[in-house]
Every structure is written in structure tokens, then in C-alpha cells.
């Protein structure tokens, strides 16, 4: 659950650091056409070892070699060729199933509005479910009020966000829980569209009052946006690769990450606001206001996105790797001439999965036949893991599909190969406990993937809440160079199957690989370390965590016989290099228990931790910020 708000004294713990953190050198993104940067079709040694030379196409049925697209000779483009992402035919409009709804600007706006209102009435308060909706908008102009409820994914199908322009609102309100409280507005996304707020709706400000497990991506707000609803509590949140023309106001948001967003004018602060690679980030001196500014995003690929070509054919754009990136990837494009951020895949390169039909067997057969996966909305019961074994495979969900293992296995495993993309999934623990729900690389993985890393986007984890379930760990990352972009790893504190001995879970994430990077890591309520980092060279840009509410007593929650509780963020003693910016750890214990530290790390010169804070309620608490220093209650570090 999002943070409970409680009064606590504020203590400044000054170590002396400005709000502009020592980040990577500021600069524009790398040239998307530079093959050395590992385009999404990038051929790797793993691809070659698998027997697929660069540029090799799959056969007409999708059978045969790896799902890697076409090799690193594919230039940035909006169109495919037989050797670069092309399919065997013009696929046209795919059968996405009943919960994917496609709107066109030629439809009467009243008809679209009625359908949107019907869906929203169903999803507004539908906190726990496994069936969502993907709402797809063909390029054009719309006049609509698009309210985004639980498990709702709003997608523009243009090459540029401005190709789909919605005049009115694309908004998330906080009415269902009462008191304009947005702290449980989980699991929803909007991407690749423009919104023009109008005075008739919320006085002309777009409202995006969300909590964890949400995202705005490739969104152009042609006006102002507020991240809270009418002064009510809010606990988010994540925006990436977007542009805000006028003003963005955080209001009551407790914490937030914006990455590669053209902000124009950010207003507001509360506990922990982190800005990575943004255009026009706010200025100030930590901890008043609690801003962390990293000038450029060191290494990232943007999330793949759906779009249609002039013939109405669907494609998936897979953006290229970029380094030292500042600002949105598209905001400087000339109107009407969007620059391709990578190279595309025809939709018929994808196996389109449906929850009423598909199992682990059918999904793995599709992967073995060289297909990528596009999972449509709904709940997928898996008697074994989805096994991604080929480099450059894309597994993408629309409408927040929910994957649940039923036999105590992982829901998803990825081999130690280059360039895999996993996006838009909610992974849920089953009744039979899993050692891990997602595994990236097998134990002992050692390959260098720095030129073409695997990446996760908007992949979230839930243990309990909707169904009773247990898992030791949400994510285990064994491969090197993995990028995790926005993940909420949640042991449920309310809902079905919730209790100290019910939805048991040790950690949200365990990182064993080297040089793993996380942007927007949210991990909450697990029973040991929320995040355990065993690999060297890790980098985290924004961390938000609540310790478990429910330890029954101190004796039941001890890291060692002499140390109370567990640190939320633990960097193992063997680690020599680690970097983190903007970490917030909170405690709201139901019983009078304590954690000795919020964060524990080695103390060598290679361990660099910038801008940490804690918040504790009146019951129990966190004794220190890091390694026995920082003080109790609410405290800020300044380094």
C-alpha cells in the first residue's frame, strides 16, 4: 500500500551536497543510428552463436532461428524491409481480443465517450483483478474525457505523440477511495499521445493522481498537469520520455521520478523528488527542497511502442540504446516529421497471446518458432515459466496482463543473452510458493551485454492482494548490464491472502549481476531486505520503499541476534562499487518494532550514496539512515 501519512519531527542530517548530484556528463542522446550503441536489432555474439547471422530473416511462418530482429545493420526507420523487421505479409489489423478496443477519429465522439465511460465505471474502483483493457487510438484529433481506471492502458498509435491529440483530458482522479486519496491508484498507463487540457474539465489542468505501478510515457501535455487530486494524499510515481508545455505540479505527492522529461516548470516538493536527464529540471539545495537532479541519463532504451503505418498496418517500434541522454527523445522533432528512435517490427513477427487460449506451452512454442510475444489483457495461469532463450526477443503486454505461476516456478525466465525486452506485465505470486517470479539469466551468468543490454519496462510484481500467494523474491537478476525502468515490487498489505504468515516474501529484488541499472525502483513490505544488491557496478536512480507493516514483534524481525529489523536497501559486504541517487525509506509499523538502519552498505570509496531520507510513524521506527548514522524519526542526508 502507499504511504500512510503521519506526523513526525523532521531532522536535517547534513553531510554537505548541492541538489545537483554528481551525475553523468550532461549531453544529448547518442545517435540512434550508431551501430556500436546496439540498436534493438543488434546482432550479438549470442545471436551468432545461436546460428543466426546478422540480417537473417525468419521464414514466412515465423519458424526457425531466434526472435532477434535483423542484426545491427538495420538503420533507424519507420518502415520495415524483409531483412529488417519485416513480416511475410501486410498484417493489417490483428485480432487483439475483446478487451482491446480501437477508436478512430471518424467515429462519433459521443459514441467513443459512452464506451470510455462504461469501461471507467467498471474499472474505477476495481483495485484487485486480472482483467484489464487496452484503449487504442488511431492517429487523429479527438475531443474526449479519457478517465483511466485500474488495469487500463491508453495507447496512441501514431509515430509521434502529437499524431493522436485528445482535447479534453486523459486523467486519473482519486474519488473512489474517498477524500481525494490517490495513494492506492495503482496499475495503469498512458503512452504515445498528446492531451490538450480544456477549462471545462478540472479548470484546464490535466490530473494524473497516481501511486506506484503506473507510468506516463511519450506523452505531450499541451498545457499543465497536476500529480494529485484536489489536495488529497498521493504516493507515486513515474513519468518518462514526455513533454509538459506549461507547468507540472507535484502537490501532495510524497515522492516522484521523472526521467528524460521536458519539464518546462516543475512546482512542488515533499519527501523525495528525483529528476534524471530532464529538460529544465527545478533548482534548489537538498534537503530543502528535497530535489535530486542528475543531469543526464547514463544508459537507457525507451520502451517499445505500437504504431500504425499509412496503410493501417501495425508495427512495434523498438528504440535504440542511448547514452548520456537529456530531454525527451522526440520533443525536438519538427512537426509532422518525427525522427524514428530505432527500428520496427511488423506485427506478424509477434505471436498475439490471449488469456482464454494460451498456456506456458503455447507461449514457449511461439518463442521457439522465432516469434516475439504480445500479450493481450487478462490473467494467464502458467504451469511453467515463459522461457525467453533467444537474443533481441520482445515480450510486451498491453492492458496490463497478469501472469501467475501455478506450480511454484517462475512466471518468466530470460537466458543470459543480449537485447531482450520485457514490458508492460504484472507478475503475480501463486498459491504454491515460487523461489523467484522473474529470473534474468541463470545463476553464475557472466556475459558482457553492455553494447546491447536486456531491459524491463513497467514490469510489476504482486504477492497477495488479489489471490493468496507466496514467493521468496519478485525479481532475481543474474545477468550483467540489465536495465530496469519502473518496477513496483509489492508484498500486499491489504486485500486477499494478506498476513505475516500468509503472503510470505523475503525480498522484492535480488541483484547478482554486475553493472545493473534501475530507474524508478519501488519495493515494499517484504519480510527481509526489500532490495539486496550482490553485484558490482550497480546504479539506482530513485528508490522508494516501505518496510513491512506487520512484523508481530521484534523477535520475529531481526537481521541478526544483535541487529533489529532489516535494512530496506542492502548492498552486500563483498560489493566494492555501487552508486545510488534519491532513496526514500519509510516505516509504518503496526507494532512497536524497530529497524536499525534504512540502508546498509560497505564503506569503501567505491560506494557512493547521494540523497537519502527516512520517514517513521509514531509506532516503532527506523533508528538510522545508513550504517548507524543519520538519526531516527524523519531524517535527510545531504550527500
Task: Please provide the spans of the model-predicted regions.
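Bacterial N-terminal signal peptides that target proteins for export
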Residues: 1-7
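Ser/Thr-rich, Pro/Gly/Ala-heavy low-complexity intrinsically disordered linkers and tails
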Residues: 1, 13-82, 90
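Acidic Gly/Asp/Thr-rich repetitive segments characteristic of extracellular carbohydrate-active
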Residues: 95-136, 341-377, 381
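Structural detector of coil-to-beta-strand junctions
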Residues: 134, 202, 209, 218, ...
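Extracellular beta-strand-rich solenoid/capping regions of secreted or surface-exposed proteins
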Residues: 113-129, 136, 141-155, 164-213, ...
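Domain-scale activation on soluble regions of proteins
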Residues: 93, 98, 114-133, 138-344, ...
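Acidic/polar low-complexity surface segments
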Residues: 123-126, 168-176, 277-283, 324-347, ...
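Right-handed parallel beta-helix
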Residues: 150-160, 183-197, 213-224, 236-246, ...
Amino acid at each position: 500500500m502507499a504511504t500512510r501519512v503521519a506526523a513526525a519531527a523532521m531532522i536535517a542530517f547534513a553531510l554537505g551536497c548541492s541538489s545537483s548530484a554528481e551525475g553523468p556528463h550532461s549531453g544529448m542522446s547518442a545517435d540512434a543510428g550508431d551501430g556500436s550503441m546496439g540498436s534493438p536489432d543488434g546482432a550479438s555474439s549470442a545471436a551468432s552463436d545461436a546460428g543466426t547471422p546478422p540480417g537473417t530473416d525468419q521464414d514466412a511462418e515465423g519458424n526457425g532461428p531466434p526472435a532477434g530482429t535483423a542484426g545491427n545493420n538495420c538503420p533507424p526507420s519507420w518502415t520495415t524491409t524483409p531483412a529488417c523487421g519485416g513480416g511475410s505479409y501486410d498484417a493489417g489489423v490483428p485480432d487483439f481480443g475483446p478487451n482491446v478496443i480501437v477508436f478512430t477519429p471518424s467515429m462519433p465522439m459521443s459514441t467513443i465517450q459512452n464506451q470510455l465511460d462504461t469501461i471507467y465505471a467498471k474499472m474505477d474502483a476495481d483495485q484487485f483483478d486480472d482483467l484489464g483493457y487496452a484503449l487504442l487510438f488511431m492517429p487523429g484529433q479527438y475531443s474526449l474525457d479519457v478517465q483511466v481506471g485500474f488495469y487500463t492502458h491508453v495507447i496512441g498509435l501514431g509515430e509521434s505523440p502529437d499524431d493522436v491529440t485528445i482535447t479534453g483530458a486523459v486523467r486519473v482522479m482519486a474519488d473512489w477511495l474517498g477524500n481525494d486519496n490517490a495513494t492506492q491508484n495503482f496499475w495503469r498507463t498512458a503512452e504515445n499521445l498528446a492531451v490538450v487540457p480544456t477549462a471545462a474539465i478540472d479548470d484546464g489542468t490535466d490530473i494524473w493522481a497516481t501511486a506506484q505501478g503506473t507510468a506516463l510515457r511519450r506523452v505531450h501535455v499541451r498545457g499543465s498537469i497536476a500529480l494529485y487530486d484536489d489536495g488529497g494524499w498521493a504516493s507515486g510515481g513515474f513519468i518518462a520520455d514526455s513533454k509538459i508545455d506549461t507547468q507540472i505540479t507535484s502537490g501532495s505527492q510524497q515522492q516522484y521520478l521523472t526521467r528524460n522529461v521536458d519539464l518546462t516548470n516543475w512546482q512542488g516538493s515533499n519527501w523525495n523528488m528525483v529528476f534524471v536527464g530532464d529538460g529544465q529540471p527545478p533548482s534548489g539545495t537538498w534537503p530543502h527542497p528535497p530535489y535530486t537532479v542528475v543531469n543526464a541519463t547514463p544508459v537507457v532504451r525507451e520502451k517499445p511502442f505500437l504504431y500504425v503505418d499509412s496503410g493501417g498496418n501495425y508495427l512495434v517500434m523498438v528504440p535504440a540504446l542511448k547514452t548520456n541522454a537529456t530531454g525527451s527523445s522526440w520533443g525536438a522533432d519538427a512537426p509532422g516529421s518525427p525522427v524514428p528512435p530505432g527500428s520496427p517490427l511488423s506485427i506478424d513477427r509477434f505471436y498475439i497471446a490471449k488469456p482464454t487460449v494460451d498456456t506456458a506451452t503455447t507461449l514457449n512454442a511461439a518463442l521457439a518458432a522465432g516469434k516475439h510475444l504480445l500479450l493481450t489483457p487478462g490473467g494467464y495461469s502458467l504451469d511453467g515459466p515463459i522461457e525467453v532463450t533467444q537474443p533481441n526477443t520482445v515480450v510486451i503486454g498491453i492492458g496490463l496482463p497478469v501472469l501467475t505461476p501455478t506450480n511454484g516456478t517462475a512466471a518468466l525466465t530470460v537466458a543470459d543473452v543480449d537485447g531482450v525486452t520485457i514490458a508492460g506485465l504484472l507478475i503475480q505470486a501463486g498459491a504454491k510458493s515460487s523461489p523467484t517470479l522473474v529470473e534474468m539469466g541463470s545463476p553464475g551468468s557472466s556475459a558482457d551485454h553492455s553494447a546491447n543490454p536486456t531491459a524491463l519496462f513497467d514490469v510489476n510484481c504482486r504477492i497477495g492482494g488479489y489471490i493468496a500467494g507466496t514467493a521468496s523474491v519478485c525479481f532475481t537478476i543474474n545477468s550483467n548490464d540489465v536495465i530496469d525502468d519502473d518496477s513496483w515490487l509489492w508484498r500486499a498489505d491489504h486485500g486477499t491472502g494478506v498476513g505475516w504468515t500468509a503472503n510470505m516474501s523475503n525480498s522484492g529484488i535480488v541483484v547478482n549481476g554486475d553493472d545493473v541499472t534501475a530507474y524508478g525502483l519501488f519495493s515494499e513490505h517484504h519480510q527481509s531486505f526489500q532490495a539486496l544488491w550482490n553485484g558490482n557496478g550497480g546504479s539506482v536512480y530513485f528508490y522508494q520503499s516501505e518496510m513491512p507493516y506487520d512484523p508481530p514483534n521484534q523477535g520475529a524481525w531481526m537481521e541478526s541476534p544483535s541487529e533489529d529489523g532489516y535494512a530496506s536497501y542492502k548492498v552486500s559486504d563483498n560489493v566494492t562499487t555501487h552508486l545510488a541517487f534519491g532513496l526514500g525509506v519509510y516505516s509504518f509499523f503496526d507494532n512497536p518494532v524497530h529497524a536499525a538502519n534504512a540502508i546498509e552498505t560497505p564503506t569503501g570509496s567505491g560506494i557512493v550514496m547521494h540523497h537519502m531520507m527516512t520517514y517513521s510513524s509514531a509506532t516503532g521506527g527506523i533508528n538510522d539512515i545508513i550504517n548507524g548514522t543519520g538519526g531516527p524519526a524523519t531524517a535527510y542526508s545531504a550527500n
